Amino acid sequence: MEKLVTQQVQNVDPKQSEILNISEIPAENPTETPIISKQKLLEAGVYFGHKASQWHPKMAQFLLKKKRNETHIIDVLKTQKMLEIAYKLVEKFAQKGAKFIFVGTKKQAKKVIEEQAVRTNSIYVSGRWLGGTLTNNRTILSRLKTMENLEKQAAENFQGYTKKEKLAKQKQLAKLQKNLNGIKGLKDVPLFSLIMLVADPLKDAIAVKEARKKGIKIIGITDSNVDPSLVDFGIPANDDSTKSITLIFTVLADAIASAKGGKKLFAYQSDENIILPEDPEKELKQTRYRNNSFEKFARQKNTLKESQVLKPNTEIQA
């Protein structure tokens, strides 16, 4: 444990090392259980990138040189290493008293964002990001105050109001709760102590931009089409799969829980103890289509051996 993470992962951007003090975090002992096994990462589909035409050149170091059906494949070994570092960063920040805001407004991220934020007593945004959440704090705090007042009135069944007024207030409260429930705790957290964990920096570009403006550190998933410089520390992985996002965000939440003496659900657990959600049918069809396309392409071009064809629960040969 004497080596440093910067010695373990040569591809870490110097900017990331400087901003997040990676050099202070001890590297994993290679004889220990990996944070997540390579097999589990493959099962989660973290290796699926986007079409080569959509890639971002700064992600080149995290991609396999050979493309499949003109689609980039993310190197799962580098995903594993970067996830390990991200875990230790989050754990370290949590130990120092940092607070976290989970952000994931795309369909595939909503459920895990809410579950893991609630589990770790963190702030979250899984619905629409309200412009100014971080940069126009006064307006957001004012809305939170309004919501709190309405909740108090609701507890008393809106006593003193007519039926029509009650319905109007109930409707107003429901709308505020839908947009603000996840950020209730924002009023008690100084922004300088926040760390943002984001599922898709492109989908939630406004949130990322506001965090940047306020000097909030950002850790997020960086798919093959994402500029990794959008975040302070990126985890190269598929950001369009429910399984992939669930795996990564549960591990990050494990880091927060561990710092507080809580239980780890996925991090450093055996494969049989890691149960991933079933992908929605649309996602499943897309995954099967990609796998079939990769297999057909490989056989036509003779670029892969049969054992290297991408199938569920098989390893990728770099």
UniProtKB/Swiss-Prot annotation:
Q: Which GO terms describe its cellular component?
A: cytosolic small ribosomal subunit
Q: Which InterPro entries match?
A: Ribosomal_uS2, Ribosomal_uS2_bac/mit/plastid, Ribosomal_uS2_flav_dom_sf
Query: From its record, what is one biological process in GO terms?
Result: translation
Q: Name the keywords, alphabetized.
A: Ribonucleoprotein, Ribosomal protein
SUPFAM superfamilies (alphabetical)? Ribosomal protein S2 (SSF52313)
Any one GO MF term held by the record is: structural constituent of ribosome
Q: Kindly give the HAMAP family that the UniProt entry links to this protein.
A: Ribosomal_uS2_B (MF_00291_B)
**Which family would the database say this protein is a member of?**
Belongs to the universal ribosomal protein uS2 family.
> What is the protein's given name?
Small ribosomal subunit protein uS2
**Species, as recorded:** Mesomycoplasma hyopneumoniae (strain J / ATCC 25934 / NCTC 10110)
Identify the taxonomic lineage of the organism of origin.
Answer: Bacteria, Bacillati, Mycoplasmatota, Mycoplasmoidales, Metamycoplasmataceae
